[in-house]
Design a protein with these regions (language model features):
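Non-globular sequence segments
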Residues: 83-86, 97-167
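Polysaccharide-binding and catalytic clefts of secreted carbohydrate-active enzymes
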Residues: 142-143, 171-185
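Short, well-ordered beta-to-alpha junction loops that form the rim of enzyme active sites
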Residues: 52-53, 95-98, 167-177
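N-terminal capping/small domains of soluble enzymes
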Residues: 1-99, 106-108, 140, 151, ...
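Short acidic/His/Gly/Ser-rich catalytic and metal-binding motifs that mark active-site loops
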Residues: 57-60, 104-105, 130, 178-183
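Aromatic side chains
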Residues: 36-37, 155, 167, 178, ...
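A generic, residue-level signal for flexible/boundary positions that often mark functional hotspots
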Residues: 3, 134-137, 178
Length: 185
């Protein structure tokens, strides 16, 4: 066993966060999400980090299949997933991520199964994002102080929901040119 803060992980095997692209179109946890993470726990993984979960389903998804936890509607699905992992003794966390300027921003703030890959002209290292073709020419802007504060609140509320769902920890995704990494220099 190993301790991380006040969480005792049964072993040093950790499943790092990945987007398995199986949530419902609205970002809700699917049965496939639950089975996938349950199987990792059944196989003996000590710590499982559920990846690519957005605190902002309207503007903070990079694909149509990202998980979302921006309101209480999502808590029961996440609770079922946490319980499935805990049943086998695993500890579990949720990776909160917002793609920032790389977000898929389709019309009317809703992703659909008709979304497709488009180029990101402002990023050589991140060539595609899944979004409606109409968004290929979207513009980005510097966030205002009010927008910054609103995003901090969204992350805080999402972390609270993760805790309410029974997860043991939260990971903040600060890599790959996503929102949090855009503040690092």
């Amino acid at each position: 066993p190993i301790r991380i803060g006040n969480v005792e992980v049964p072993n040093r095997i950790c499943h790092v966060p990945t987007d398995i692209s199986s949530s419902h179109v609205d970002g809700a946890v699917s049965e496939r999400d639950i089975r996938h993470h349950e199987n990792l726990a059944r196989g003996g993984t000590g710590l499982i980090v559920v990846g690519a979960t957005s605190p902002d389903g309207k503007t903070g998804r990079s694909t149509v299949t990202n998980l979302v936890i921006d309101n209480d509607y999502y808590i029961p699905g996440f609770a079922r997933m946490a319980a499935a992992m805990h049943r086998y003794g695993a500890k579990c966390a949720v990776q909160l991520q917002h793609p920032g300027r790389q977000a898929a921003l389709p019309r009317e703030g809703k992703l659909t199964s008709n979304d497709q890959a488009v180029s990101l002209p402002w990023s050589q290292s991140h060539a595609i994002v899944y979004a409606n073709a109409d968004e290929a020419k979207k513009t980005v802007h510097v966030l205002s102080t009010d927008e910054d504060i609103a995003l901090v609140d969204l992350f805080s509320e999402a972390a609270w929901r993760v805790q309410q769902a029974g997860f043991d920890a939260v990971e903040l995704h600060a890599a790959h040119g996503y929102l949090i990494s855009q503040f690092m220099s």
